[in-house]
Amino acid sequence: MKVKPLGDRVLVKPDAVETKTAGGIIIPDTAQEKTQRGVVVAVGDDKEKIKVSVGQKVIHDKYAGTQIQIDGVDHLILKSNDLVAVVE
């Protein structure tokens, strides 16, 4: 399925959540924190507000966006102002 965000929205594929600590302790699902990083998969057509492009790694607000599944993979649709940084 192909999803094209509208306006100033951005489609992000979140990074995988860590399931193990550096010391080897397994973190249960209930204790795992939602990741705030991901890769931009698609952008809307509002070029004035959107300052990122497809393929860039970004950090977003913790509770922002709408979670959707595309072909069984979790994604987030975020407003461009919910993005807080680009990871270089």
From Swiss-Prot:
Its main location: cytoplasm. This is Co-chaperonin GroES. InterPro entries: Chaperonin_GroES, Chaperonin_GroES_sf, Chaprnonin_Cpn10_CS, GroES-like_sf. The lineage of its organism: Bacteria, Pseudomonadati, Spirochaetota, Spirochaetia, Spirochaetales. Together with the chaperonin GroEL, plays an essential role in assisting protein folding. The GroEL-GroES system forms a nano-cage that allows encapsulation of the non-native substrate proteins and provides a physical environment optimized to promote and accelerate protein folding. GroES binds to the apical surface of the GroEL ring, thereby capping the opening of the GroEL channel. GO terms for cellular component: cytoplasm. Gene3D superfamilies: GroES chaperonin. One of its GO terms (molecular function) is ATP binding.
